[in-house]
Curated annotation (Swiss-Prot):
Its main location: nucleus. This is Tyrosyl-DNA phosphodiesterase 2. It comes from Gallus gallus. DNA repair enzyme that can remove a variety of covalent adducts from DNA through hydrolysis of a 5'-phosphodiester bond, giving rise to DNA with a free 5' phosphate. Catalyzes the hydrolysis of dead-end complexes between DNA and the topoisomerase 2 (TOP2) active site tyrosine residue. Hydrolyzes 5'-phosphoglycolates on protruding 5' ends on DNA double-strand breaks (DSBs) due to DNA damage by radiation and free radicals. Mg(2+) binds at residues 129, 159. One of its GO terms (molecular function) is single-stranded DNA binding. Keywords: Developmental protein, DNA damage, DNA repair, Hydrolase, Magnesium, Metal-binding, Nuclease, Nucleus. It is found in: Nucleus; Nucleus, PML body. Can partially complement the absence of TDP1 due to its weak 3'-tyrosyl DNA phosphodiesterase activity. Residues 127-131, 233-238, 271-273 are annotated as: Interaction with 5' end of substrate DNA.
Amino acid sequence: MELEARAEPRSPRAGRGEEEEDEDEELRLAKRRKVLCSEFAAVTSSDEAVASGFLAGSGWHLERALDAYFEAPMNEQTTAAAAGGGSAGPGSCIDLTADDTASNTSSSGADSKQQDDDSSFSLITWNIDGLDLGNLQERARGVCSYLALYSPDVVFLQEVIPPYLCILQRRAGGYTIIPGNVDGYFTAMLLKKPRVKVLKQEIIRFPTTSMMRNLLVVHVNISGNELCLMTSHLESTRDHSKERMKQLQIVLNKMQEESQSTTVIFGGDTNLRDSEVAKLGGLPKNITDIWEFLGKPQHCRYTWDTSSNTNLRIESKCKLRFDRLYFRPAAEGGHIIPRNMDLIGLEKLDCGRFPSDHWGLLCRFDVIL
């Protein structure tokens, strides 16, 4: 015998309360989806209609939607834009993965030659300005093009954001990628496979930072030599000079604590002024500023130069050596020696902007066998 289920009567006031909660939840969901659409559109240079289509198809998961977008052939991206009532736009014709095969083919000769040559290795450090979402897709492609061109063994990056990390993970398949965080903006280290063998890693948080800054430390082996690699983005702006100096002291202490049999290289966007280093009494005797070690070459002195780099479009013209590389050789002989240094990222892209508001630093090292 079936019994008819009857709902118990509820008061009109209780019903209104539940309806209001439902409406609030729907409003929060709508706002969240609008933010996701804006972020997707900014990264891909598409419109919100395209963003909505890819996000909806990926369960409103931003990273999955970006993966789907960058994996899609260009005609599918254009079709999605047309279906959404918008145009693909100038940015959406840039597919970061379309020329993967060509890039890998063109650089394979250089890669194999460098892997066979254990007498040298190269390193790039670069603040890629991921916080600037303008032309982000094309600027990211520009950075990846430099990585393909120079094929560095080690890359230090600062101001990486999650969508940019997705691009790097898809584009730089020949590298082990170690991020210093996964939220907000952070540093990342790229280590070429299989030449650079990762031994261990750690993240040291700066205890009094107000900008989520930390020190990413990775121990590796290159050509039989053990290295301790470190990168960081020290506290920004002139007003945070004291905090920046505290962070620098933590970095220098960590460099000195490492085993004397290990070569230590630190690099990143330090935001340092020379006067701040002087206030700390200069660098320890066993730690060298590589730019100074190489004779202070003027062509690569200023890595943040608003007189030449117009990305920020600010009227004041500043030239500062924010991006630096420090070196502590192994005590058991000079197995690794800095050879030269150059700036990269000096050419404007088709969008009329540079890959970043910072120039990158490319440094080459000799390995004494």
